[in-house]
Amino acid sequence: SIVPLGLPVPIGPIVVGPR
């Protein structure tokens, strides 16, 4: 899981954050 920025949002196998 990856959380580059913002709040963690689960998208597929990767967790990304909104701008």
Curated annotation (Swiss-Prot):
Highest taxon of the lineage: Eukaryota
Function: Has an oostatic activity. It inhibits yolk synthesis so inhibiting the subsequent yolk deposition in previtellogenic follicles.
Name of the molecule in the record: Neb-colloostatin
Natural source organism: Sarcophaga bullata (Grey flesh fly)
